[in-house]
């Protein structure tokens, strides 16, 4: 069983025009995408500007309304945002393309990295510090960077 399975995903935006501002056409931002994501693997979605990469990501996390298709999470169809389980919201998140504008420059690096750990894990201070250190090492940063502000990095 796949972690996330997307079948025939369609996200369309209406084009309005005329005197009464009626829908005259649609922009087919995503039209019939199939995608399978296995648990524990890392994926990248690559394409030209305007090809629908961000729209697919936003549809997966519920920020875009889906015109058609299904998104299945661990065998369960995710239909409406309200029906999504908290474990789905904990496990499915989006990393923004422009990390410099999406991170708070007043926060220390340790606080930025530890925020999801604090929200979704029950770690002691020592366990949290150790996990942050492991995560810093993965991206090639030292423990010294943990106390820096985002604006310094």
Explain the meaning of each model-derived region.
Residues 51, 151-153:
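Conserved small/polar residues in nucleotide/adenosyl-binding loops
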Residues 61:
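Helix-to-loop junction immediately C-terminal to a conserved catalytic motif
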Residues 69-80, 88:
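Conserved ABC transporter NBD signature motif
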Residues 99-113:
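Conserved catalytic motifs of ABC-family nucleotide-binding domains
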Residues 46-48:
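The feature captures the beta-strand-to-loop junction immediately N-terminal to the Walker
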Residues 14-23, 65, 80-82, 109-127, ...:
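ABC-type ATPase nucleotide-binding domains, specifically the catalytic core motifs of the NBD
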Residues 127-145:
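Conserved ABC ATPase "signature" region
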């Amino acid at each position: 069983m796949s972690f996330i399975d997307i079948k025939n995903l369609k996200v369309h935006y209406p084009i309005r025009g005329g005197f009464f501002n009626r829908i005259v056409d649609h922009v087919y931002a995503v039209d019939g995408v199939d995608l399978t994501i296995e648990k524990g693997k890392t994926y990248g979605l690559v394409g030209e500007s305007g090809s629908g990469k961000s729209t697919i990501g936003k549809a997966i996390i519920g920020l875009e309304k889906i015109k058609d298709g299904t998104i299945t999470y661990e065998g369960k169809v995710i239909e409406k945002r309200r029906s999504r389980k908290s474990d789905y919201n904990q496990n499915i998140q989006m990393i923004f393309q422009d990390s410099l504008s999406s991170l708070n420059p007043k926060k220390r690096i340790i606080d930025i990295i530890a925020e999801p750990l604090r929200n979704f894990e029950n770690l002691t201070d020592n366990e949290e510090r150790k996990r942050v250190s492991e995560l810093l090492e993965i991206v090639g940063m030292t423990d010294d960077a943990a106390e820096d502000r985002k604006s310094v990095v």
